[in-house]
Amino acid sequence: MAQRAFPNPYADYNKSLAEGYFDSAGRLTPEFSQRLNNKIRELLQQMERGLKSADPRDSTVYTGWAGIAVLYLHLYDVFGDPNYLQMAHGYVKQSLNSLSKHSITFLCGDGGPLAVAAVVHHKMNNEKQAEECITRLIHLNKIDPHAPSEMLYGRMGYISALLFVNKNFGEEKIPQSHIQQICETVLTSGEDLARKRRFTGKTPLMYEWYQEYYVGAAHGLAGIYYYLMQPSLQVSHAKLHNLVKPSVDYVCQLKFPSGNYPPCVDDSRDLLIHWCHGAPGVIYMLTQAYKVFKEERYLNDAYQCADVIWQYGLLKKGYGLCHGTAGNAYAFLSLYSLTQDAKYLYRACKFAEWCLDYGEHGCRTPDTPFSLFEGMAGTIYFLADLLVPTKARFPAFEL
């Protein structure tokens, strides 16, 4: 872990240190808000220049044009500037011109561009176009009957696109029956694989991606279980307690002494502190388990995640969401939202302060340096989210 991160130079929380960032009610100080706003404007200009050389055919939310649309949609929600909505419209239109026709998910498939387009059209009062996008999104389910179950390329990634639409419309545009049908397929496939690979003595559910049993949020168990525990999926009480809870407990048993988690089952290397692999993604499963099952041990494990992220979360890989400092900071905001403990808001502010020196630490340059999940767009999204900390949610994942 240590060799993949910069040493954390910041003192941990105390009340007097935090006063430079927010007041006792958790409202950011005008000075810190201004610093965030200035950086958002500066990075947006850099990003727009950089996007001129981006891949014109990448339609995805993860690294492509739909991700830039998600950023501008978010900026519109935060600042209310209609120019941001127009920018979102332009970018999502570009993404719809180059759909993959084979992947269905929100982050890496056609589900993302269609879901984002539906929401953008809805906010622009283009209800006919919004309905067309929703119809196409619902029909995507037929494209890949053999999809895995994980977030980036699988069924949960499709479900996240459906929930994104319902959340932003404030009503059930995607029928609950459609969502539950896919959810049942995820549960059944997890039971089948656990039996087939003889995991049933340890866990009633198991999932794989490319013959690996991944643990983290992007490809693995933590991301799948986080969604299965969401009230909006309406998993039955019996299945929550008999299938999901013992499967969550199995993931908890994989924890390293550091408080971190392995990238895969049976991987003993304690290396990665990323949203995609490790504690910064597993923490969402733990906080959701605490909300649903009311057992203190899940919250204690989440606190351990936060501590290891604070120590090793300023990543040499960069400032992005998937495997960068901004993505790691969202773990603190998630805990702050749950507990209202000012320590976690302070830690998020300090990671944001690191991001205010974007490009000055000698981090490696991502393959897609201006994208939402690997690059600058994700950092801008985080800095804007931090302006109203209680509303902050990890984009395209956290509900």
UniProtKB/Swiss-Prot annotation:
Family as reported in the entry's similarity comment: Belongs to the LanC-like protein family.
Reported tissue expression: Expressed in brain.
GO molecular function: glutathione transferase activity; metal ion binding
Stored SMART domains: LANC_like
One Pfam entry name: LANC_like
PANTHER family xrefs: GLUTATHIONE S-TRANSFERASE LANCL1, LANC-LIKE PROTEIN
Keywords linked to the UniProt accession: Acetylation, Cell membrane, Cytoplasm, Membrane, Metal-binding, Transferase, Zinc
Topological type in the membrane: Peripheral membrane protein
Superkingdom: Eukaryota
EC number in record: 2.5.1.18
Gene name in the database record: LANCL1
Annotated signal peptide: none
GO cellular component: cytoplasm; plasma membrane
Single GO biological process annotation from the record: carbohydrate metabolic process
Protein name per the record: Glutathione S-transferase LANCL1
Residues annotated with N-acetylalanine modification: 2
List of residues binding Zn(2+): 276, 322-323
Enzyme class, first EC level, given as a word: transferase
Function: Functions as a glutathione transferase. Catalyzes conjugation of the glutathione (GSH) to artificial substrates 1-chloro-2,4-dinitrobenzene (CDNB) and p-nitrophenyl acetate. Mitigates neuronal oxidative stress during normal postnatal development and in response to oxidative stresses probably through GSH antioxidant defense mechanism. May play a role in EPS8 signaling. Binds glutathione.
Cellular localization per UniProt: Cytoplasm; Cell membrane
Quaternary structure and interacting proteins, as annotated: Interacts with the C-terminal of STOM. Interacts with the EPS8 SH3 domain. Interaction with EPS8 is inhibited by glutathione binding.
